[in-house]
Amino acid sequence: MDSNTVSSFQDILLRMSKMQLGSSSEDLNGMITQFESLKLYRDSLGEAVMRMGDLHSLQNRNGKWRGQLGQKFEEIRWLIEEVRHRLKTTENSFEQITFMQALQLLFEVEQEIRTFSFQLI
C-alpha cells in the first residue's frame, strides 16, 4: 500500500468526520455516498493486498500503518456515535432508514478493516 493510497483513505475518512449530518435529503445522500466510497475503497485495498501475496513487504513499505489504522478506527467510532445520535433524534422514517443503513455499513466496514488488519499482523 503506497502512501497515496493511505492518504486517499485518510482523506475520505477525514471528510466524512467533518460532514454536517443535517436532516435534508441531500445531506443524507451525501453521507451514504461517502460510506459507499469507503466500502469500495476497502474492497479494492483488500484485493490489492491479496494480489501482492507478501504481506510482510506491505508492512515494511508502510511502517506507520498501525497508527493510521488506529486513527481510522477512532474516526469510524466517532461516525458510529454521530449516526446513532442522529438516528435517535429524527422522527422522519426516510431519515431513520437511511441512518440505519449508514450505521449497518459502518459496522460492516469496521469489522472488515479489523479482519484485514489482523491479516497484516
Swiss-Prot record:
Belongs to the influenza viruses NEP family. It is found in: Virion; Host nucleus. One of its GO terms (cellular component) is virion component. It comes from the Viruses. Average number present in a viral particle is estimated to be 130-200 molecules. This is Nuclear export protein. Interacts with protein M1. May interact with host nucleoporin RAB/HRB and exportin XPO1/CRM1. Its main location: virion. It comes from Influenza A virus (strain A/Aichi/2/1968 H3N2). The keyword Transport applies.
